[in-house]
């Protein structure tokens, strides 16, 4: 009788030890894999930001060249010599169609807006006039403009009378390209991540779900200055993401950021299956023993 109790105690002890080893193994494997996945996602985020910068640089070179070619056309120069807003506004429609941009602005040498072509009716000459001095007074030729819920990347080009070397400015040409849902999806594919453009307290465009956009506004800082997440974990709509951000220069404030995010939960979803497999193996080993 005593031998049976001893064997029973021994068996229970073996079961307890095996179970403890199994669960310890599960925890160690899970933490190790999670850490490796985290490091992999952080590297992917860095690569995604690099891919965005390369894509954006090539895009900006192309669009800046388009603005320079358009500003150098003889008919554009001749148009600006009229100094007549009605004439310039009428003729600018053909230029806008030729440029293929989402926005076109012409201003005289004093910075007065003479023509504006864009689709949203809420973007008026008055709003363009408020924005334009910030652009023309800057040394940069590329800017971001958030107006009435629309975000544009704009390119400024001088219109010269005669050769550019003469530096006799007739006026200015501004071409704008909107960051819409299509552009956000394209950037998401290039970065192989979710993306979100945030301007102050507004998510302008993103590939996130609406609930996740609201959470991003709540948990993420307004700007990367001063130590924003660079591959840190944030929760959006009950899902864990690793995120980083890129500052995009805008005249004045608030700040404009591009957020790049990868789902940590999706990347570690396989761990549930792995845990079940290890648990089954552990129980099999216990029963076989």
What does each model-identified segment do?
Residues 4-32, 279-288:
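Extreme N-terminal signal-anchor transmembrane helix of membrane signaling/transducer proteins, especially
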Residues 22-48, 52, 56:
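N-terminal membrane-insertion alpha helix
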Residues 45-66, 70-79:
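N-terminal alpha-helical signal peptides/signal-anchor transmembrane segments
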Residues 67, 101-106, 194-197:
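Short, hydrophobic-rich beta-strand element in sensory/regulatory alpha-beta domains
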Residues 81-103, 112-148, 180-192, 201-238:
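Extracytoplasmic/periplasmic sensor domains and loops in membrane signaling proteins
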Residues 140, 149-163, 228-231, 237-247, ...:
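A short beta-strand signature within small-molecule sensing/ligand-binding domains used
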Residues 170-171, 255-258:
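Short beta-strand edge/capping elements of PAS-family sensory modules
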Residues 186, 244, 258-281:
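Membrane-interface helix-start motif
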């Amino acid at each position: 009788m005593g031998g049976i109790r001893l064997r029973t105690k021994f068996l229970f002890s073996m079961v307890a030890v095996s179970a403890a080893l199994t669960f310890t193994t599960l925890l160690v494997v899970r933490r190790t894999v999670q850490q490796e996945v985290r490091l992999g996602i952080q590297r992917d985020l860095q690569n995604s930001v690099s891919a965005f910068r390369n894509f954006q640089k090539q895009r900006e070179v192309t669009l800046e060249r388009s603005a320079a070619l358009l500003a150098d056309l003889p008919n554009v120069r001749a148009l600006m010599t009229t100094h007549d807003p009605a004439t310039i506004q009428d003729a600018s429609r053909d230029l806008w169609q030729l440029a293929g941009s989402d926005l076109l602005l012409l201003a005289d040498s004093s910075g007065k807006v003479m023509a504006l072509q864009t689709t949203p009716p809420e973007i008026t000459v008055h709003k363009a006039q408020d924005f334009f001095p910030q652009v023309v007074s800057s040394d940069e030729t590329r800017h971001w403009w958030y107006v009435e819920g629309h975000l544009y990347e704009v390119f400024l080009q001088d219109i010269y009378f005669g050769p550019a070397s003469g530096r006799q400015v007739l006026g200015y040409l501004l071409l704008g390209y909107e960051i819409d849902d299509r552009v956000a999806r394209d950037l998401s594919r290039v970065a192989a991540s979710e993306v979100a453009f945030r301007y102050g307290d507004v998510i302008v465009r993103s590939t996130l779900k609406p609930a996740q956009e609201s959470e991003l506004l709540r948990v993420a800082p307004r700007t990367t200055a001063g130590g924003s997440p660079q591959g840190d974990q944030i929760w959006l709509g009950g899902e864990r993401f690793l995120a980083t951000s890129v500052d995009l220069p805008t005249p004045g404030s608030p700040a404009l950021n591009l957020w790049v995010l990868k789902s940590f939960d999706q990347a570690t979803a396989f761990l549930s299956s792995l845990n079940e497999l290890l648990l089954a193996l552990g129980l099999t080993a216990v029963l076989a023993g």
